[in-house]
Amino acid sequence: MENIEQRVKKIVAEQLGVNEAEVKNESSFVDDLGADSLDTVELVMALEEEFECEIPDEEAEKITTVQQAIDYVTAHLDK
């Protein structure tokens, strides 16, 4: 079973059409990986589906890097 970090990075790579090797923890979805606002919405939806959790819009707006996505999922997965 892949850990949360690997799963998040895989989803980011798939959603943004980038090589998984380019997806670093500190990568910004917009600045480093070329995401636009629609990409980020789709990314949040993919994370919600993968981890069976709901990410409210106000929280989703704060998730701008790969590490923030990993941290959010990790913090909310057990709830």
Curated annotation (Swiss-Prot):
It is found in: Cytoplasm. 4'-phosphopantetheine is transferred from CoA to a specific serine of apo-ACP by AcpS. This modification is essential for activity because fatty acids are bound in thioester linkage to the sulfhydryl of the prosthetic group. Keywords: Cytoplasm, Fatty acid biosynthesis, Fatty acid metabolism, Lipid biosynthesis, Lipid metabolism, Phosphopantetheine, Phosphoprotein. Pathway: Lipid metabolism; fatty acid biosynthesis. InterPro entries: ACP, ACP-like_sf, PP-bd_ACP, Ppantetheine_attach_site. GO terms for cellular component: cytosol; membrane. Its main location: cytoplasm. The keyword Ribosomal protein does not apply. The keyword Ribosomal protein does not apply. Residues 2-77 form the Carrier domain. It holds the Pfam family PP-binding. Gene3D superfamilies: ACP-like. Belongs to the acyl carrier protein (ACP) family. One of its GO terms (molecular function) is acyl carrier activity. GO terms for biological process: lipid A biosynthetic process. Carrier of the growing fatty acid chain in fatty acid biosynthesis. It comes from Laribacter hongkongensis (strain HLHK9). It comes from the Bacteria. The modification O-(pantetheine 4'-phosphoryl)serine is found at residue 37. SUPFAM superfamilies: ACP-like. This is Acyl carrier protein.
